[in-house]
């Protein structure tokens, strides 16, 4: 989705977007940030801040906060949602963060690296690394492609229980999971004119390492099963998830054109 698409949905964000800040979501990012030693003296950036869901939390815990987004309407909503004096708002594409080179102790990115171009994804991750001071930390949430496959497997088994014909069960599962909307090699989901990136864990690790991040640790943001999705029948199964990733840069990262 481009800046204009995000501009259009800014006023109805929670109607359009499933976020890790909604009720019943198990989001380890918040506890991680809360437990950082010396956070009161740190400068943190929220890259792709959207309407500012995380900003009040950050402003109350860190010395200074820089909120970055390429959507003017998202930034306007973020400013309304967070009026703390230690927050600076900047309209900037994540593909060029050279203005912030080496300025941050910590960056968070919450489902913000969604570009369908792998070249753009790699560029954003390099730019993100370059904003960090030596030893600086990335704490990011990224949509999981394995979670899509996991849900598909559950749906297939459900359909098999309802049918003696395995091929018919597979066709039903494919329809329910919108198989035609996914590119499982590139890790892309398409809906109408919008395309977005999802990540395999092995792929995300590799891309972050190439961007300059080290000491990577993976966890999960867990989403509840929703009845309106038709998946309440899986409520006893492990939840769907996004990836929660932590990593650091060992030294200052050069800016890449």
What are these regions (language model features)?
Residues 1-39, 57, 139-171:
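Conserved class I S-adenosyl-L-methionine
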Residues 45, 51-96:
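Class I SAM-dependent methyltransferase SAM/SAH-binding core
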Residues 99-107:
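A short acidic, Gly/Pro-enriched loop at the edge of an enzyme's catalytic core
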Residues 106-120:
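A short SAM/SAH-binding and catalytic strip from SAM-dependent methyltransferases
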Residues 122-134:
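A short glycine-rich, Lys/Arg-flanked "PGG" loop and its adjoining helix->strand segment in the class I
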Residues 195-212:
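Short alpha-helix
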Residues 214-224:
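Conserved S-adenosyl-L-methionine
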């Amino acid at each position: 989705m481009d800046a204009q698409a995000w501009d259009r949905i800014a006023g109805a964000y929670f109607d359009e977007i499933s976020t890790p800040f909604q009720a019943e979501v198990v989001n380890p990012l918040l506890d991680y940030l809360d437990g950082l030693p010396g956070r009161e003296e740190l400068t943190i950036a929220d890259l792709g801040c959207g309407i500012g869901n995380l900003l009040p939390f950050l402003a109350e815990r860190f010395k200074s906060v820089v909120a970055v987004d390429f959507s003017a309407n998202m930034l306007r909503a973020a400013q309304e949602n967070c009026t703390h004096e230690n927050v600076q708002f900047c309209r900037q594409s994540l593909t060029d963060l050279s203005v912030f080179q080496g300025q941050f102790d910590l960056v968070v990115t919450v489902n913000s690296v969604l570009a369908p171009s792998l070249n753009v994804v790699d560029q954003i991750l390099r730019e993100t690394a370059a904003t960090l001071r030596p030893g600086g930390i990335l704490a990011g949430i990224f949509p999981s492609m394995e979670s899509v496959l996991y849900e598909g497997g559950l749906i297939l088994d459900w359909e098999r229980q309802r049918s003696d014909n395995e091929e018919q069960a597979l066709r039903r599962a494919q329809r329910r999971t919108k198989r035609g909307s996914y590119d499982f090699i590139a890790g892309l989901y398409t809906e109408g004119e919008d395309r977005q990136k999802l990540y395999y864990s092995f792929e995300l690790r590799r891309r972050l390492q190439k961007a300059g991040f080290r000491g990577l640790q993976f966890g999960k943001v867990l989403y509840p099963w929703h009845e309106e999705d038709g998946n309440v029948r899986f409520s006893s199964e492990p939840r769907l998830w996004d990836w929660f990733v932590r990593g650091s840069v060992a030294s200052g990262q050069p800016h890449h054109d």
